[in-house]
Curated annotation (Swiss-Prot):
Pfam families: RNA_pol_A_bac, RNA_pol_L. SMART domains: RPOLD. Part of the RNA polymerase complex. The gene is rpo3. Keywords: Cytoplasm, DNA-directed RNA polymerase, Nucleotidyltransferase, Transcription, Transferase. This is DNA-directed RNA polymerase subunit Rpo3. Its EC number is 2.7.7.6. One of its GO terms (molecular function) is protein dimerization activity. It is found in: Cytoplasm. It is an enzyme of class 2 (transferase).
Amino acid sequence: MLDIIELKDNYIKFSISGITPAIANSIRRTLINDIPKLAIENVVFHHGEIRDSEGNVYDSSLPLFDEVVALRLGLIPLKTDLKMNFRDQCSCNGEGCDLCTVKYSINKLGPADVFSSDLIPINNPDLKPVDPMIPIVKLKKGQAMLVTCEAIMGRGKDHAKWQVTSGVSYKYHREFKINKNELENWSFYKDKCPKSVISENENEITFTDDVECRYLQQLFDEKSGVTITEDDTKFIFQFETDGSLTAIETLDYALKRLKERFNNLMESLSE
């Protein structure tokens, strides 16, 4: 069973019960390596003179190597549509169409700082950079930047630029059972961590650190009156995304992807 503990656009914390450590690690690896994401793969730089509408001439040579700029462009998180095809699986046979490729352009005249907001989607205006203020390069007077880019779908196992998540971690569900008769200051923990209380009776009170409370860490130092147990069939996960997908979209896809891979494995074993 899956329960969401905390949810934001780009962050989620949830619990899953009734699974083994091997399954938990499979979920973690899927979240890191196997989520589709849109990222810039091809960059074409215009080299030579550029003229503005008033006839002023600019030099399109950049202060950084083209390879460095291309790498920076590839690492800019882009809004992602999971309905897009992978280029090698598209009906266009890898030529690049609107179903598998998003084209972008940058046309900037110096002196100016070039930011990710200058990366303009051409054929799909909704798939813009997540953060408009990521710096790319600084142009001096008389310099210009004119590039066209192609973004395609990929997975984190192929390159870090296609990795949606960061900080993917999990731990066992843990409970701290306090004997009220043996630990005099038990009420201190109840006052400081009210959301962590999961049960209470006349003689005992039980906390969990599924909902984090820094004061619970002090219970590890108590000499008596505290029993700490871990459940190796229930896990607490948390991760955040770079904004290309929401956290709930990422989790939903990961679970479906894992189920699909298990089904494919079972089919291959039965043949």
